[in-house]
């Protein structure tokens, strides 16, 4: 996703900062099985990092029967440093933490992680806002629905492309039973009244 499109000076691979151009083919990386979390940062820090790491840890255990030793303080430090290196605004940004249970390269025998800056966010704090959009739904179930997997990411991309071809702006993915699953890879938040 963003490895392919976002201009970055550096990414963090297993705690080491490297230039994206020095990575193996980014497209093949995204095609490998991986779990991910998009993390909103404020003031250069990730305020709910422990929750994101817990989600990844649980998913890794349930889907792969593996444990991880991701240190919250080390990941927090790497996120802050990565935002600084890539000159992201201090107010609000989004980073993606990807966990590759089978490693990034063929033949790897260990779980690896990648942190990348995703995009600056246009609001300074948690804000509810609205925009009138043309929304359309696409039926597409991902294996292990509800977990942040590469398959779910590909299903979201498929839904977005399908809706754009139909002339819409935003894709809501739904299950074969008609249950809304999310919009653009993000959970749904509905406010009524």
Regions picked out by a protein language model, each given a short descriptive name:
Residues 82-88:
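Phosphate/pyrophosphate-binding loops at sites that engage ATP/ADP/AMP, CoA/4′-phosphopantetheine
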Residues 88-99:
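Ordered, amphipathic secondary-structure segments that act as subunit-interaction surfaces
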């Amino acid at each position: 996703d963003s490895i392919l499109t976002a201009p970055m000076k550096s990414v963090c691979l297993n705690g080491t900062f490297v230039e994206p151009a020095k990575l193996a083919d980014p497209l093949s990386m995204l095609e490998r099985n991986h779990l991910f979390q998009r993390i909103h940062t404020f003031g250069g820090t990730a305020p709910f990092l422990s929750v994101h790491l817990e989600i990844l840890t649980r998913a890794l255990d349930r889907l792969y029967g593996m444990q991880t030793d991701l240190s919250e303080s080390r990941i927090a430090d790497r996120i802050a440093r990565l935002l600084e290196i890539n000159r992201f605004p201090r107010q609000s940004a989004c980073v993606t933490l990807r966990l590759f249970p089978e490693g990034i390269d063929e033949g790897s025998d260990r779980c690896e992680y990648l942190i990348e800056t995703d995009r600056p966010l246009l609001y300074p704090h948690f804000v509810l806002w609205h925009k009138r959009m043309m929304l359309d739904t696409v039926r597409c179930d991902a294996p292990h629905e509800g977990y942040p997997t590469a398959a779910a990411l590909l299903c979201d991309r498929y839904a977005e492309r399908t809706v754009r071809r139909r002339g819409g702006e935003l894709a809501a993915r739904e299950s074969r039973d008609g249950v809304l699953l999310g919009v653009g890879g993000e959970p749904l938040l509905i406010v009524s009244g």
